[in-house]
Amino acid sequence: MPTLWSPSTQHHGSSSGSMSSPLRKSVRCAQMALSPCSSNIQPCDDRDSQGTAEWDSSSTSEDSDFEDSLRRNVRKRAAKRPPKAIPVAKHPKKQSHIVPGGNDKNKSVPPTSDLFDAVKAARSCAQSLVDEWLENYKQDENAGFLELVNFFIRACGCKSTVTPEMFKTMSNSEIIQHLTEEFNEDSGDYPLTAPGPSWKKFQGSFCEFVKTLVCQCQYSLLFDGFPMDDLISLLIGLSDSQVRAFRHTSTLAAMKLMTSLVKVALQLSLHKDNNQRQYEAERNKGPEQRAPERLESLLEKRKEFQENQEEIEGMMNAIFRGVFVHRYRDILPEIRAVCIEEIGCWMQSYSTSFLNDSYLKYIGWTLHDKHKEVRLKCVKALAGLYSNQELSSRMELFTNRFKDRMVSMVMDRESEVAVEAIRLLTLILKNMEGVLTSADCEKIYSIVYISNRAMASSAGEFVYWKIFHPECGAKAVSGRERRRSPQAQRTFIYLLLAFFMESEHHDHAAYLVDSLWDCAGSYLKDWESLTSLLLQKDQNLGDMQERMLIEILVSSARQAAEGHPPVGRITGKKSLTAKERKLQAYDKVKLAEHLIPLLPQLLAKFSADAENVAPLLRLLSYFDLNIYCTQRLEKHLELLLQQLQEVVVKHVEPEVLEAAAHALYLLCKPEFTFFSRVDFARSQLVDLLTDRFQQELDDLMQSSFLDEDEVYSLTATLKRLSAFYNAHDLTRWEISEPCSRLLRKAVDTGEVPHQVILPALTLVYFSILWTVTHISESTSQKQLMSLKKRMVAFCELCQSCLSDVDPEIQEQAFVLLSDLLLIFSPQMVVGGRDFLRPLVFFPEATLQSELASFLMDHVFLQPGELGNGQSQEDHVQIELLHQRRRLLAGFCKLLLYGVLELDAASDVFKHYNKFYEDYGDIIKETLTRARQIDRCQCSRILLLSLKQLYTELIQEQGPQDLTELPAFIEMRDLARRFALSFGPQQLHNRDLVVMLHKEGIKFSLSELPPAGSSREPPNIAFLELLSEFSPRLFHQDKQLLLSYLEKCLQRVSMAPSHPWGPVTTYCHSLHLVENTAEASSQGPPHSKKRCIEVPRRLQEEESSSQGESLQLNSGPTTPTLTSTAVKRRQSPRTVGKRQKGGPGPGPGPGPGPGPGPGPGPGPGPGPELICSQQLSGTQRLKMSSAPCFQIRCDPSGSGLGKQMTRLSLMEEDEEEELRLLDEEWQCGDKLLHSPSSPSEHGLDLLDTTELNMEDF
């Protein structure tokens, strides 16, 4: 590693060799701390031994001059100011601290809270605080320095202080040990992490104070007697403490101190260079013009600069070697983040000394950190370097070595890190030509389509600088000229179309436009160029390119008019600013002014293509339609209405008809002055459609056979009327009654084609809804009963259609029926609408059963019933899945709103585990809502679901050997999920769980084998399912249930000759005393004092981490892991007593490896396998028939080598699993509804962060 020392400092080594300065001691301590036994260091990476050895050797060779400089003795020159009345030694002889003078022996400890409280409150600026402290220091150096030391101690959260006597008699390590013992905080918080408004700004004020302290001392005390060596030595010692507060605060102070010293060193370097130039200029003068006095003065000044630089570099070396080298791998991520952030500042401010591979490697290694804060600091530090083209040119070796890691971070699991990683690669793209390959860039291209807006926008900026800027930027100089350049705009459009086509995400133009909006918005809002390219006859665009260009035009119009990202894209912004709203209004007006005259031309040109017409019609949603009136554009409105009518008559596609109906709805608002003209055009269109429908319907009703053309014509007319009935009230045309007669004929005779039935069902459904909207309190009872009669008749028609042979008709009837039943449910009268009570409708039992049967046949399909999934495309499978999810959601709504009996939910709950991936979120939400409605009934429904599945399994497989079947294993998993659904509120659900157990026991013994038979009862295996709910029981309830089971077994006419297996399993589950919920509610309270907590799977995680090598060709030596918390002060005897668990016989922590006193394996219980006596002490922790074995532990840990039973270990693992699954239940599956979830499509796979630090 290159040294920070000047080569001219070598001649000072011998003269200062006998000096014993505190800085030298701290340096030696820092060098000793580099050994593997250094404490509190977390391994940075899991690298192979070869890579580690390679870096060790390289580091040794590179750092040789640095090590030599560290071994040099730093000699400070004497102070140049007049001596004080009481001279104080600059470097004390005793240990490494300043010894107060004799006159200060009886002085009290100076007030230490004034400075700390001032920094905490931030009442005044840091400069005034430092100036005030400097005045106190100049009056009494010892008291002033002691006040500064105690300020840092108080900043750590320690209430103890350092007294003058402690400085006299104790070393640094002894002082820190004393402070550690006195560190008796009430909570785990300290000033840097404490919550509350009083501590909110403490860290900023603390860092500003340290910065200002060095800044104010750089021209006086820093080189003139100030004991900075002692302060650095103290901070180095505190940074190696096991107390987190000491380590965190002192590291932050040392790093900020180092940053300030780097700035001072930079200034000294500049002054030194300036002095050298002045000296050379003076020396090059002629003998007559040369001034010897000035040469001598410049030489003295250069010598002073050289000495000052040596002192600063000595301090910097001590901090770097004593603090940074250890703490950048600290177990606390906040400490690691501070180190990485500051070294990035050093590289930017003093690049000549710090910007080299010897320092860059620390950032490169830490790119693999497990915590996002540390990775984020690494990426931001590198971004500051790569943003400077001069600095980036010196980072070629680092870029080549760590480029793959930086590229992989664009798919980081944390979106903030991924965003900064993409911005970092954008800087590399700008300032380092040819570094990123095509494969590297392709990994970023697809990110423009993901749901996270920040990531997509960053990726859009990368795409802009990679693809568009080199071509478009070369054709224009400024932004204004670029917008006016037709050639640059046309080039941009062609490049955008090429990129869009190659991406293979042709349905997501809105996402692409939103991603490029921030960096290329001026291009995308050039609607003149977009429309001119579409309307030109010789534009040489293919059909696919025209379609994409229209999608881009519509997407850019939507983005400008609405001002927010498309649906499904996550953004942290809540509202627009005033400036953004003003720009949005301006863009909306300009959009309408330009496109209103051109929209009829576009519709006329692309009217034959349904995929082009539908998006063009959506453009009306983004116009300011008042412009038709204010700017006298009525003639363009007439042309638009003509094109609308032609589109409706020409097309039958649902998306085109819906877009046309919605466009006409936007124009038919009464507040517009042209409303009468648009309403007349709408009436003409509907009259045309209704006349055609009446004629074609008469032909159908009078004839039993229609040719294909007649069926197609009638179907097309019904589709058009249905689409317009959705957006417009067509009640006055009275087309509902003819459609009802048509549907009745279809149900009675089956002679109506299914193509006609689908739109007819929808049309009648919309007519009922429009009638409901006209009802008010003044509506007569006769009108209400007429509406209900129509609704009941339509429900009967839909019920008949549920048994139709066409699946599309069945699904359409189910959806419409579910919606109507929900609308006319008892919820209809909520909110003071009692006048609607006559309309409330309750379905009959037959209808409820048919709805449940339909759900089983169309939603919960077995894998073989889904058809040939391999031959169908992925998007078809996804659409079918969404359709099934809609059907299930409709049925669940009927359950939750009281339309159907809640017991019918068992048909849904019993498929919870088997179809968890497809419908898990819907069923979980239904289960949660059902429990909120009726807790007791919901628990019975869960038990009913298990009973139904068990009964079905017996009917299929018979009662023998059920527990080994895959179906029974799935049932156990389902029972476990049901148990987890109760949540951690054990006391709240106590009665429900006990009731569930009792009902389950009754069911298991409800059917008995014939008298004299040795077979088990057919339902006895149900007890194994019931055992999954046992961890939710209290110990008292377990004992009661054991007694209840014993009584039930005693009623069996023939006692078994050997215990039944399910009974044994169930009894074992009831013998477990502690579980997760009970331990959390009944366990002893945690001590507030900080102590060491070693995770149970620490060794497993450590061993597993060794197998995950990053395959890097470099890596630092991994130090020995040590704790970072203060151990609880208790004797081994006390620990042993705590671990015994209670009085009574049992395994205990014996003095040797053999088993302690306690009962051995004895005979098991009687035939019923019921233990009726109360267990106490450690007997509750083990079954009498369980085998014992020993756990080999660390011999140095007292009280840890106790015996454990296999059952107790199983219990611990099971309860840990239950705790984790409880958390999963509580947090829910948030990604299931995401349009770009990691489990779908592969567009949002942000789960590739390589973790190389174990989480302790």
Swiss-Prot record:
Tissue specificity note: Testis specific.
Biased composition annotated in UniProt, kind: Basic residues: 72-83, 1126-1140
SUPFAM superfamilies, sorted: ARM repeat (SSF48371)
Keyword Phosphoprotein: yes
Places the protein is found: Nucleus; Chromosome
Record's comment on post-translational modification: Phosphorylated.
Gene Ontology CC terms: chromatin; condensed nuclear chromosome; lateral element; male germ cell nucleus; meiotic cohesin complex; nucleolus; nucleoplasm; nucleus
GO molecular function, one term: chromatin binding
Domain of life of the native organism: Eukaryota
Polar residues: compositionally biased ranges: 1113-1125
Signal peptide range in chain numbering: none
Biased composition (Low complexity): 1-22
Region Disordered, annotated ranges: 1-110, 1096-1169, 1230-1256
Comp. bias (Pro residues): 1144-1166
UniProt entry tagged with the keyword Cell membrane: no
Keywords on record: Cell cycle, Chromosome, Chromosome partition, Meiosis, Nucleus, Phosphoprotein
Residues of the SCD domain: 324-409
Pfam families associated with the record: HEAT_SCC3-SA, SCD, STAG
Biological processes per GO annotation: establishment of meiotic sister chromatid cohesion; homologous chromosome pairing at meiosis; meiotic cell cycle; protein localization to chromosome; sister chromatid cohesion
Phosphoserine, modified sites: 1234
Gene3D superfamilies in UniProt: Leucine-rich Repeat Variant
Self-association and partners: Component of the meiosis-specific cohesin complex, which also contains the SMC1 (SMC1A or SMC1B) and SMC3 heterodimer. Such complex likely contains RAD21, or the meiosis-specific related protein REC8. Interacts with CCDC79/TERB1; recruiting cohesin to telomeres to develop structural rigidity.
Protein family per UniProt: Belongs to the SCC3 family.
Function per UniProt: Meiosis specific component of cohesin complex. The cohesin complex is required for the cohesion of sister chromatids after DNA replication. The cohesin complex apparently forms a large proteinaceous ring within which sister chromatids can be trapped. At anaphase, the complex is cleaved and dissociates from chromatin, allowing sister chromatids to segregate. The meiosis-specific cohesin complex probably replaces mitosis specific cohesin complex when it dissociates from chromatin during prophase I.
Protein name (record): Cohesin subunit SA-3
